[in-house]
Swiss-Prot record:
Belongs to the RecA family. GO terms for molecular function: ATP binding; ATP hydrolysis activity; ATP-dependent DNA damage sensor activity; damaged DNA binding; single-stranded DNA binding. This is Protein RecA. It is found in: Cytoplasm. Keywords: ATP-binding, Cytoplasm, DNA damage, DNA recombination, DNA repair, DNA-binding, Nucleotide-binding, SOS response. The lineage of its organism: Bacteria, Bacillati, Cyanobacteriota, Cyanophyceae, Synechococcales. GO terms for cellular component: cytosol. GO terms for biological process: DNA recombination; DNA repair; SOS response.
């Protein structure tokens, strides 16, 4: 019985091999035909792709980098939205500075006509080499964005903001004229046009957006972003940034505490939350982010108001400890290295975890409330 079955199995395997060989040959022919018609790289096996892992751009905040899985993904569309004065433009200026530090080229499409070059320079932006456009209409702005992307010479384009991309029909019309859905149609057409070019050029495009309230919403969240739904679908990452606290020394306000929720992420787990300080005139407090992570990973320990490192007290209160880190760059580098090692080993902190951690809760409870005036901030 077993001897009779062997030739049958051999015949079946031969037929399968022959059929798979024919399929492979047909596949090679059709792939070759597609590449001749549409160019090299128009179709490929995913395993043959030169870049399997998505490269990232640092946001300037270590906690937000963790929440995003490394930073802003390159070659993708990103939307940053939130209320006024919540830190949207500051986030993008830090991204521009990071791109320029690495030898890249960045462009800022200033549809709001509100870019402050002095503030941008204080955040590390090379304003002399930053490409800036202040378009008159939404069509002009998006056409400029498309041409910059097509050039493959620009690494990052920031559009500030979608709400300010006014359609030509609205500008040329009379005040009070209704052009229902004009901006949404404009954004929908633009996203269809530029998305394919973004993938080919590797350019990252960050759209800043404002919030509006839906009329007649009794239950649920009445907030929505401007420009229709196209950007929501095409964006690989959507960040919701909010101002949750005003930082004070005595009665003097010197910054804000911002909370960013990753509302959408196609390249890493979404719905993570990151918090960081934004200092007026200075931007994101990188040392503040480092101290928060050092506290959560127990590289720096805290008892009451005192922070200690290797058993030695280094500062009373958060502000004094940040000042100590500024004044001791060698110790700061060692602490940063230890924090990154712990995070690489898989340590969970509030920015890379979906569940609230005890250290994060302790940290939140120790911060002054909005109405509270603190001598240490």
């Amino acid at each position: 019985m077993s001897n009779e079955g062997k030739p049958l199995q051999s015949t079946e395997s031969t037929k399968i091999d022959a059929k798979s060989g024919e399929k492979e040959k047909a596949l090679s022919l059709v792939v070759g035909q597609i590449e001749r018609n549409f160019g090299k790289g128009s179709i490929m096996r995913l395993g043959d792709a030169s870049k399997m892992r998505v490269e990232t751009i640092s946001t300037g905040a270590l906690t937000l980098d963790l929440a995003l899985g490394g930073g802003y993904p390159k070659g993708r569309v990103i939307e940053v939205y939130g209320p006024e004065s919540s830190g949207k433009t500051t986030l993008t200026l830090h991204a521009i500075a990071e791109i320029q530090r690495n030898g890249g080229v960045a462009a800022f499409v200033d549809a709001e006509h509100a870019l402050d070059p002095v503030y941008a320079a204080s955040l590390g932006v090379d304003v002399e080499n930053l490409l800036v456009s202040q378009p008159d209409t939404g069509e002009m702005a998006l056409e400029i964005v498309d041409q910059l992307i097509r050039s493959a010479a620009v690494d990052l384009v920031v559009v500030d903001s979608v709400a300010a991309l006014t359609p030509r029909s609205e500008i040329e019309g009379e005040m009070g004229d209704h052009s229902v859905g004009a901006q949404a149609r404009l954004m929908s057409q633009a996203m269809r046009k530029i998305t394919g070019n973004i993938g080919k050029s590797g350019c990252t495009v960050i759209f800043l957006n404002q919030l509006r309230l839906k009329i007649g919403i009794t239950y649920g969240n009445p907030e929505t972003t401007t420009g229709g739904n196209a950007l929501k679908f095409y964006a690989s990452v959507r960040l919701d940034i909010r101002r949750i606290q005003t930082l004070k020394r005595g009665t003097e306000e010197y910054g804000i505490r911002a909370k960013v929720k990753v509302a959408k992420n196609k390249v890493a787990p979404p719905f993570r939350i990151a918090e960081f300080d934004i200092l007026f005139g200075k931007g994101i407090s990188t040392l503040g982010c480092l101290l928060d992570l050092a506290d959560e990973t127990n590289v720096v320990t805290r008892k009451g108001a005192w922070y200690s490192y290797e058993g030695d007290n280094i500062g009373q209160g958060r502000d004094n400890t940040i000042t100590w880190l500024e004044q001791n760059p060698e110790s700061k580098e060692i602490i940063e290295k230890l924090v990154k090692e712990k995070l690489t080993e898989g340590s969970e902190v509030s920015a890379n975890s979906m569940r609230p951690l005890a250290s994060a809760a302790r940290q939140a409870s120790s911060r002054p409330k909005l109405s509270q005036v603190s001598a240490n901030g």
